[in-house]
Amino acid sequence: MNIIRKIVKSCKDEEEHKPNPVSAPPDDDDLWLPPPEYVPLAEITGKKNMRNFCINGEVKVCSPNGYSFRILRHILKSFEGVYSGNRRMIGLVKVVIGLAQSGAPVPEGMNWVYKIRRTLVFQWAESSGPLDGEELEYSQEITWDDDSEFVGLQIRVSARQCHIQGRLWCINMNSRACQLWADMSLKTQQSNEDKNTSLLLE
């Protein structure tokens, strides 16, 4: 039975036998697409709960036999239950994970590493989101394992409020990031003040 659980194996290169070369992730998806909802197309009008965050995010995928996004989606569908970080930051973490894995990975031994370093504009609904000035340092490994396959997902996200101007992006609702956000049950609602943005409810 396939189960999601916290660390059961470590993603190390020191294996007793040399694994088969990892195959490249599928390239039939868009490579790097910006967030479709959380960075506005135009100037945000409702500035009350808007905050710029300087983000460093890394998602490292360890799999001796290669992996597919089907497996990653399977892992992330249980993200709500295994997330060990600050609950007030979970929406931000979900956005960063989706964006990172929408990018092009860099091979690192038997791992594939996705990184993102951006200034992102986030807007939370009233009473949601981090406290003013709150920072996040989050690190976790989630694994999926059965008799035939092993995939380890190492996630690291650091976020702090900053005053650097966030960039304006285009919306693409068909991005891989949107698919992963749906898998992680990202909770949002459209802003009443700005049709180009959605509010994070978590």
Swiss-Prot record:
Short sequence motif PPXY motif: positions: 35-38
GO cellular component terms given for this protein: host cell endomembrane system; membrane; viral envelope; virion membrane
Gene Ontology terms, MF aspect: structural constituent of virion
Positions of the UniProt region annotated as Essential for glycoprotein binding: 115-151
Further remark: Most abundant protein in the virion.
Subcellular location per the Swiss-Prot or TrEMBL entry: Virion membrane; Host endomembrane system
GO terms under biological process: viral budding via host ESCRT complex
Function: Plays a major role in assembly and budding of virion. Completely covers the ribonucleoprotein coil and keep it in condensed bullet-shaped form. Inhibits viral transcription and stimulates replication. Plays a major role in early induction of TRAIL-mediated apoptosis in infected neurons.
Protein name per the record: Matrix protein
Keywords: Host membrane, Host-virus interaction, Membrane, Phosphoprotein, Viral budding, Viral budding via the host ESCRT complexes, Viral envelope protein, Viral matrix protein, Viral release from host cell, Virion
Entry membrane topology: Peripheral membrane protein
Subunit structure: Homomultimer. Interacts with nucleoprotein and with the cytoplasmic domain of glycoprotein.
Lineage: Viruses, Riboviria, Orthornavirae, Negarnaviricota, Haploviricotina
Organism: Irkut virus
Family that this chain belongs to: Belongs to the lyssavirus matrix protein family.
Domain notes: Late-budding domains (L domains) are short sequence motifs essential for viral particle budding. They recruit proteins of the host ESCRT machinery (Endosomal Sorting Complex Required for Transport) or ESCRT-associated proteins. Matrix protein contains one L domain: a PPXY motif which potentially interacts with the WW domain 3 of NEDD4 E3 ubiquitin ligase (Potential).
